[in-house]
């Protein structure tokens, strides 16, 4: 059995990873060692039936004793520890949820239902750093993988509807707190059937603009609104989140020529599922039944939702998908621009295939 160290296992992504590993009995195949950046010496969790104490996540000697390190601690930790560990001569496997190492030449972005061939080649060539991808990119490829695998995609334009969980646990709390403030502000009026809805709306809008809602994390109110910008601003006018679409898609697929991917990334008031609306330029005219067949056959989690109003409203929403590994794709139809233009709408849990699940599955391969 390999010695596997876990850092950041108590955070949001780490907690989901632990839950999935327990469900899949992954701990049966490894010797886990749990680390902490702040609570060393305290009792370690009993995942996998082991007992012990939390180790120091900054102790290079303790880390060097591991065969595999899995970290969900974030980019600052990676940037501090990873170079020191490699410079010390450590040759173990590093599995990371943070974005810091994604675009490094000696790292592979992992999404095995989509790029197992790239992962296998990397392992055969001595690659030992494996990084989870951007959530929207991973979820797009899980849903639309059949089109990419069959070399049918000329380019992709996307508008995202990204959940609060993409920002982190504090962002989710802030969204719910904002919702509570708005409701409490008009609760009496809502309870009165004779109250005028426009009066209620005005009260809500006034409170939203008042500066009284908590916005420490988002910077502006999200409840009852949206934020059409995610991550840093780049010189070309893109947000960094939008830049990741093309950069990471092409690295994951190891394309020989760049597939253009661009669009707008928008934060909405969903809790943990990202949705995406796509305009896809195909390389040739492919019938909708064939498109549906290719998408459904690509991986066990891709689910084609018929382009029917009732089914779509029931199955192609964050409410339906949250907490599941299913990555449904629907609203598939040809657009007025021509027979090669395809629309699609996808939903996926940002904390599962968008974050924890690729890490879990990579660890399973290495263990």
From Swiss-Prot:
Keyword terms, alphabetized: Amino-acid biosynthesis, Diaminopimelate biosynthesis, Lysine biosynthesis, Methionine biosynthesis, NADP, Oxidoreductase, Threonine biosynthesis
HAMAP family to which the protein is assigned, alphabetical: ASADH (MF_02121)
Entry-annotated residues carrying S-cysteinyl cysteine: 135
Subunit structure, interactors included: Homodimer.
GO biological process, one term: isoleucine biosynthetic process
Chain residues that bind phosphate: 102, 244
GO molecular function annotation: aspartate-semialdehyde dehydrogenase activity; NAD binding; NADP binding; protein dimerization activity
Pathway(s) served: Amino-acid biosynthesis; L-lysine biosynthesis via DAP pathway; (S)-tetrahydrodipicolinate from L-aspartate: step 2/4; Amino-acid biosynthesis; L-methionine biosynthesis via de novo pathway; L-homoserine from L-aspartate: step 2/3; Amino-acid biosynthesis; L-threonine biosynthesis; L-threonine from L-aspartate: step 2/5
Annotated binding of NADP(+), by residue: 10-13, 37-38, 73, 165-166, 193, 350
Function: Catalyzes the NADPH-dependent formation of L-aspartate-semialdehyde (L-ASA) by the reductive dephosphorylation of L-aspartyl-4-phosphate.
Descriptive protein name: Aspartate-semialdehyde dehydrogenase
Gene3D superfamilies on file: Dihydrodipicolinate Reductase, domain 2, NAD(P)-binding Rossmann-like Domain
InterPro entries hit by this protein: Asp-semialdehyde_DH_CS (IPR000319), Asp_ADH_gamma-type (IPR011534), Asp_semialdehyde_DH (IPR012080), NAD(P)-bd_dom_sf (IPR036291), Semialdehyde_DH_NAD-bd (IPR000534), Semialdhyde_DH_dimer_dom (IPR012280)
Entry-linked SUPFAM superfamilies: Glyceraldehyde-3-phosphate dehydrogenase-like, C-terminal domain, NAD(P)-binding Rossmann-fold domains
Reaction equation(s) it catalyzes: L-aspartate 4-semialdehyde + phosphate + NADP(+) = 4-phospho-L-aspartate + NADPH + H(+)
Alphabetical list of CDD domains matching this protein: ASADH_C_bac_like (cd23938), VcASADH1_like_N (cd02314)
Organism placement in taxonomy: Bacteria, Pseudomonadati, Pseudomonadota, Gammaproteobacteria, Enterobacterales
Similarity-based family: Belongs to the aspartate-semialdehyde dehydrogenase family.
């Amino acid at each position: 059995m390999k010695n596997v160290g876990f850092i950041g296992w108590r955070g949001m992504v780490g907690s989901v990873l632990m839950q999935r590993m327990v469900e899949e009995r992954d701990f049966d195949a490894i010797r886990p060692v749990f680390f902490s950046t702040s609570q060393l010496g305290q009792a370690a969790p009993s995942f996998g039936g082991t007992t012990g104490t939390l180790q120091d996540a900054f102790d290079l000697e303790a880390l060097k004793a591991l065969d595999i390190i899995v970290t969900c601690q974030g980019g600052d930790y990676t940037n501090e520890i990873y170079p020191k560990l490699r410079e010390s001569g450590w040759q173990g496997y590093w599995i990371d949820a943070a974005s810091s190492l994604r675009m490094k030449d000696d790292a592979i972005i992992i999404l095995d239902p989509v790029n197992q061939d790239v992962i296998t080649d990397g392992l055969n060539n001595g690659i030992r750093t494996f990084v989870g991808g951007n959530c929207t990119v991973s979820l797009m490829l899980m849903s639309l993988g059949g089109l990419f695998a069959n070399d049918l995609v000329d380019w992709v334009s996307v508008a995202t509807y990204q959940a609060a969980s993409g920002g982190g646990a504090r962002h989710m709390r802030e969204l719910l707190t904002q919702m509570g403030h708005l409701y409490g502000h008009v609760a009496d009026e809502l309870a009165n059937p004779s109250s005028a809805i426009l009066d209620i709306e005005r009260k809500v809008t006034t409170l939203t603009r008042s500066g009284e809602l908590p916005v420490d994390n988002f910077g502006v109110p999200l409840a009852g609104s949206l934020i059409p910008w995610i991550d840093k601003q780049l010189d070309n006018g893109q947000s960094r989140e939008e830049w990741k679409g093309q950069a990471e898609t092409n690295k994951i697929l190891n394309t020989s020529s760049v597939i253009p991917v661009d669009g707008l990334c928008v934060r909405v008031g969903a809790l943990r599922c990202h949705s995406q609306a796509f305009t896809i330029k195909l390389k040739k005219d492919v019938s909708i039944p064939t498109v549906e067949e290719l998408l459904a056959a690509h991986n066990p989690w891709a689910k084609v939702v018929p382009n029917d109003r009732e089914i779509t409203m029931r199955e192609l929403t964050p409410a339906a998908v949250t907490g599941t590994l299913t990555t449904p794709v629907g609203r598939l139809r040809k657009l007025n621009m021509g027979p090669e233009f395809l629309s699609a709408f996808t939903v996926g849990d940002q904390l599962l295939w968008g974050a924890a699940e690729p890490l879990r599955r990579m660890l399973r391969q290495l263990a």
